Swiss-Prot record:
Classification lineage: Bacteria, Pseudomonadati, Pseudomonadota, Gammaproteobacteria, Oceanospirillales
Catalytic activity: IMP + L-aspartate + GTP = N(6)-(1,2-dicarboxyethyl)-AMP + GDP + phosphate + 2 H(+)
Organism: Marinomonas sp. (strain MWYL1)
A molecular function (GO) term: adenylosuccinate synthase activity
PANTHER family: ADENYLOSUCCINATE SYNTHETASE
Known pathway: Purine metabolism; AMP biosynthesis via de novo pathway; AMP from IMP: step 1/2
EC number: 6.3.4.4
Family: Belongs to the adenylosuccinate synthetase family.
Name listed for the protein in its UniProt record: Adenylosuccinate synthetase
Length: 432
């Protein structure tokens, strides 16, 4: 009987999901994206060669693995085409391996224009969006005016819907934001060309998934961003526009929740965040600079440097609860090599030193939180390439055990380097 596993980030994204997904695709028949868009960045390093994907599931490099983009993803046709062509140049048969739901809302030029105009208007209160139209595309979905992949394949339906939605967007762009309108002819012509490119990849993804399930195949659901960026459960409003938590997998694919067997939470051995928003354990000293330098903390999508801080057990406990995390994959443990002291946030206090209890539901709560730390001894030995848990330095083992106690779930996988063979698999989610 097959296993159906959700893999997602438990922090603010950039946890190293791409490498872990690629490692575990050895055992799967399909990898499925269920939310987000091309604002995600998945970096894969195989035999020293780096491939960065933003939209296509990380399993695309694996022969025999079907990659599926589910209905919960907002799809930029231009971004998808660029990725597919790059993969084809590398000899990867991306068109054959990729299937796309006809129900995916499209990201079109007016979404990008409104996204960038709004962020500019916010000034110092900007949210930190990538400016790629993700949020506005999700707005259209909820407002029931989205143009979806299936609409694009019908030229008359596409023209009718595009005319209607452009009237709305061009009014807002010109009258409120005082920027140039978007040309109907340009969007329509480009859309028709893109329709023919997409057509071979569009499929009934719900039936495809359930056929795989009935056949006893292993299926992986690949999350984008991180749990603390979830539109409902993250540091609102400094969040993304989709449900990045495990509940997004059933909704974003049409795969019933009771068919899911395991949730793997990808977690850095420290904490990072890109862009604006609260970050209780953020460091502004040499320790923070060292983590960023050793961890090469620059966003795969934006190139922006990431803010760095110590491990936050409080935020992790929250992520474990809202995702029903079965086990953790701890990444970038090697970045802590050479640290004399490592701090772990075990609780929050307010400005007066009083304990903060319960779950925080917005950015105001997180901004008032002050981290309460426990100091643990570091290690001087290298963890890179360690082949099993016992081969890790004693203090590294103790650090991992402490984190397990704090968050209440086991560390099932440990990443000690960027290459997929630099990984300790204690318990494989697909073989339990």
């Amino acid at each position: 009987m097959g296993k159906n596993v959700v893999i997602l980030g438990t922090q603010w994204g950039d946890e190293g999901k791409g490498k872990v997904v690629d490692l575990l695709t050895e055992d799967v028949a399909a990898v499925v994206r269920f939310q987000g868009g091309h604002n995600a960045g998945h970096t894969l390093v195989i035999d020293g060669k780096k491939t960065v994907l933003h939209l296509i599931p990380s399993g695309i490099l694996r022969e025999g693995v079907q990659c599926i983009i589910g209905n919960g993803v907002v799809l930029s046709p231009a971004a998808l085409k660029a990725e597919v062509l790059e993969l084809l140049e590398q000899g990867v048969p991306a068109v054959d391996r990729l299937k796309i739901s006809a129900a995916c809302p499209l990201i079109l030029p007016y979404h990008i224009a409104i996204d960038q105009a709004r962020e500019l208007a916010r000034g110092e209160k900007k949210i930190g969006t990538t400016g790629r139209g993700i949020g506005p595309a999700y707005e259209d979905k909820v407002a029931r005016r989205a143009i979806r992949v299936g609409d694009l394949l019908d030229s008359e339906r596409f023209a009718s819907k595009l005319k209607e939605v452009l009237e709305y967007y061009n009014f807002v762009l010109t009258q409120y934001h005082k920027v140039e309108p978007i040309s109907f002819d340009e969007v329509y012509t480009a859309g028709l060309e893109m329709a023919e490119f997409l057509r071979p990849m569009v499929a009934d993804t719900i039936t495809l998934l359930h056929d795989l399930r009935k056949a006893g195949a292993n299926i992986m659901f690949e999350g984008a961003q991180g749990s603390l960026l979830d539109v409902d459960h993250g540091t609102y409003p400094y969040v993304t526009s989709s449900n990045t938590t495990a509940g997004g997998a059933p909704a974003g694919t049409g795969f019933g929740p009771l068919y899911l067997d395991y949730v793997l939470g990808i977690t850095k051995a420290y904490t990072t965040r890109v862009g604006s928003g609260p970050f209780p354990t953020e460091l502004f000293d040499e320790d923070g600079e060292r983590l960023g330098r050793r961890g090469h903390e620059f966003g795969a999508t934006t190139g922006r440097s990431r803010r760095c801080g110590w491990f936050d057990s409080v935020a992790l406990r929250h992520a474990v609860q809202i995702n029903s995390v079965s086990g953790i994959c701890l990444t970038k443990l090697d970045v802590l090599d050479g640290s004399s002291v490592i701090k772990v946030c075990v609780s929050y206090a307010d400005e007066n030193g009083n304990p903060v209890a319960g779950s925080l539901v917005d950015s105001e709560g997180y901004e008032k939180a002050r981290p309460v730390y426990v100091e643990l001894p570091g290690w001087t030995e290298s963890t890179v390439g360690a082949e099993n848990f016992e081969a890790l330095p004693k203090n590294a083992q103790d650090y991992i055990r402490f984190l397990e106690e704090q968050v209440g779930v086991p560390v099932d996988i440990i990443s000690t380097g960027p290459d997929r063979n630099e990984t300790i698999v204690i318990r494989d989610p697909f073989k339990q």
